Amino acid sequence: MPNLLEKTRKITSILQRSVDSLETELPYNTMASRLADIIDCNACIINGGGTLLGYAMKYKTNTDRVEEFFEAKQFPDTYVKAASRVYDTEANLSVENELTIFPVESKDTYPGGLTTIAPIYGGGMRLGSLIIWRNDNEFSDDDLILVEISSTVVGIQLLNLQTENLEDTIRKQTAVNMAINTLSYSEMKAVAAILGELDGNEGRLTASVIADRIGITRSVIVNALRKLESAGIIESRSLGMKGTYLKVINEGIFAKLKEF
């Protein structure tokens, strides 16, 4: 049996994973799975708004309502608000407690069900909650030490992800600003008309038709598209007589055009 030190090392090793290695749909599934294996429980991670970031069901609970939460990737508002008022780890909560993850209809099935909730902090901010539970068997002091360490590790990873997202947003906005600054008034007019033709972020367009409608030459549209493509704002592909296929890959351009 791994001792407390070995389990602690397994948890802290999670920090060696880069943010880029996180899954897109549920970024913390692997992390929740590792925590569930180490602490021997079911586990889930939610952000401050109750959105499910990852979960692992080591033990089947057979509760349809809980599984519906996982499928919807969203916990109920009432539960999220109650969890947000937990400022320190609340351990071994019974099925009678409002913070139990066991629905009321499963109390008779799992009378010994126990839930532990640990707040997740990062950079002095509340980022979410780590929720673990068992159908029976209390979480020991060693388990709770691991829970405290786990919530800290998850908080660091969440903060890293937020930082990565912020840096990505800044990079994209800078690219948009630089691209816009290279456009003439006519080219800006052309870009606004072109993107207005798209169905969402992509679509097919015919440059000559747009040029005639807004009173500019086709070459202005071609130049505008080249500038946006070279800046990494759009991708385009010629469809021959059918026109041009266009896809926006930096959505910051839409917000910038609203200022035009």
UniProtKB/Swiss-Prot annotation:
The keyword Repressor applies. It is found in: Cytoplasm. Coiled coil: none annotated. GO terms for cellular component: cytoplasm. One of its GO terms (molecular function) is DNA binding. Its main location: cytoplasm. Residues 207-226 bind DNA. CDD domains: HTH_ARSR. Keywords: Cytoplasm, DNA-binding, Repressor, Transcription, Transcription regulation. GO terms for biological process: negative regulation of DNA-templated transcription. It comes from the Bacteria. Residues 1-159 are annotated as: GAF domain. DNA-binding global transcriptional regulator which is involved in the adaptive response to starvation and acts by directly or indirectly controlling the expression of numerous genes in response to nutrient availability. During rapid exponential growth, CodY is highly active and represses genes whose products allow adaptation to nutrient depletion. Belongs to the CodY family. This is Global transcriptional regulator CodY. It comes from Streptococcus pyogenes serotype M1. The gene is codY.
